Amino acid sequence: MGLSDRCTGAIPRIDTLCRTIVAECVKRGFQGVLADFETNPYSDRLSFLSRLSARLSARGMALYCPLSLPAEGAALLVGTGLSGGSLRALLEETACRYGAERLALDLERVMMDFPLPCPSGCGTPLTREELLALREKHPSSVYFSRELMAKYFTYSAGSGTHFVLFDDADTLAAKLAQ
């Protein structure tokens, strides 16, 4: 089962919600829950996820949480879609902090166009078609970043230089091998 966190405010009746989620998982034969929480604006989320994890675990089910909400007993999702740093270093640091047995890879297929310089580290997401169109319009060498475990190329346009980071079958396999 997948849970999102697009609601506003605190979660009312956390225990009731946890019981309802577990009952639905049992009813439908689900193996666990993925907490797809992209932000953490409310202080009750970690408590909610820890309680949910305990209830799921008691029924032999798993809870997968983002690293930003490391709920007790949950498997923690480590995103592989980096735009800076090193995937290996992130995995090693996270394994040391939480234990390798608690980690699960969130294998993200990245396709992003970054203007240079890019102090925010946030690029523009690309569709596969947009990526292919950029490659055709700006033919240049494609390189592999051992740190990011992704491929990239650069191009110049009227607005300046761009760095395009992307994954393919080879880079996704390399990320899994980490």
Question: Where are the predicted features?
Answer:
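Substrate-binding cleft/loops of secretory-pathway carbohydrate-active enzymes
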Residues: 68-87, 112-126
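Short amphipathic alpha-helical segments and helix-helix/interface helices
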Residues: 49-54, 88-95, 176
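Extracellular/periplasmic catalytic domains that process cell-envelope and extracellular macromolecules
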Residues: 70-71, 97-99, 156-157
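Catalytic-core region of carbohydrate-active enzymes that cleave or remodel glycosidic bonds
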Residues: 82-102
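Residues at the N-termini of beta-strands
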Residues: 30-34, 102, 178
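Chitinase-like catalytic core of GlcNAc-active glycosidases
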Residues: 1-83
